[in-house]
Amino acid sequence: MAIEKVIIQNFKKFKNPFEVKFNENINLLVGDNESGKSTILEAIHVALTGMYAGRNIRNQLSTYLFNREAVEEYLASVENGQPIAPPEIMIELYFKSGTLPEYEGNGNSEKSDGIEGIRFTISFSDKFNSEYESLLKTEKIISLPIEFYEAKWFSFSRDEKMPRFIPIKSVMIDSSNYRYQNGSDVYISRVVKDFLEPEDITAITQAHRNMIDEFAQNEAIQSINEKISAASTVMNGKLSLSADQGVQNSWESSLVTQVDGIPFAHAGKGAQCIIKTQLALSHKQAEKASIILIEEPESHLSFSRLSELMGVIEKAASGRQIIASTHSSFVANKLGLENLILLSGDNCCSMQSLKKETFEFFKKVAGYDTLRLILCKKSILVEGDSDELVVQRAYMDTHEGRLPIQDGIDVMTVGGVTFKRYLEIAQTLKQRNSCCYR
């Protein structure tokens, strides 16, 4: 099961319908900051699972999910007395043909028949028409009336769906996101719990309750409670200290996950990232998921540890579709430049027109900084370090002391062997590159 294409409209960065196509196996989203890489991953995940930032999207509806320009246009129309329709978020996932025949139809923005997919919307609900009309007449609207919105899922056959019944599942892995509760990482605790069988959870609950009971029976605690009771002036009842027995699964908030005897929150950030990713790829939810979404797997990792992680991700890709965002040339080279999807403004392009030997070269020699060329606006390619110094000085002498990088021009030393391969990348991107000192 794989996604062939995604169309996003009015969700965060993307106002106009934005289309991106995917390979069946590995896909790498690259682009400058704020280019929409994370937004695409979030859009796919919420459309398949109904989850956003770890919570049900129905409980997370907010004006900040909408494209700001679309919201401002709507508010301006209301202020001018000619209100347009409230903006609507639309996310469409197009599945590989033959994956889910029952999801086939023309209920998509392209109005095309014979296509399988799911359509997710956050839109104004008609059942609130009277309330909305009253609001327009009686109050000044200065923000999107999100209380009148609802989230819905439809197959392309126009049948309404619940996300938990969508056969294609995704898992979102963001190892750089840290959410701590009582010193324990919420994400890692949830993943570890997922490994446990019901009898294991029962055993932990019983052991935790026994620990609380022992605390209450401790002689020192009983003596302290007697002092507190004697010193207090409460009219009814006695004051005392006790461990909170809480609810049935209270152990989840009081126990912490450890790595080699060290609480997970106090382990190195690099170790945390690689452990999170490895566990997330191997836990039950990921095993059931056919689509793995990974946010910047290189976070906090050294070159050698990142190399190990690439092997784990490549292994996980077997039989599943992986869509990852990255700023790392090593990740891009190792997982294949042919899988690259470059985001730029409202457009995207792939690198599949590169020669096969170029893909293979950068896979074998993954240390080259290919993304530096791919993401820059303009570049000057030179063969050696001395050439770079000469070009930098020549540019300064003719541009009032300014360095090329200050004008958005990146001077790159690429060496003689890789020169033609960098040129091939530049030609694929149709960038304007100046090549000096060959």
What are these regions, as identified by a protein language model?
Residues 62-78, 355-375:
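Surface-exposed acidic, glycine/proline-enriched linker/cap segments
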Residues 81-86, 110-113, 144, 282-287, ...:
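Conserved catalytic network of the ASCE P-loop NTPase/AAA+ motor domain
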Residues 87-91, 113-118, 146-149, 166-170, ...:
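Short glycine-/polar-rich loops that comprise or flank the Walker A/P-loop
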Residues 90, 96-218:
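Electropositive, glycine-dotted interaction segments
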Residues 192-275, 279-291:
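Extended helical coiled-coil dimerization/tether regions that scaffold
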Residues 378-382, 386-438:
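Conserved helicase/translocase motor-coupling segment
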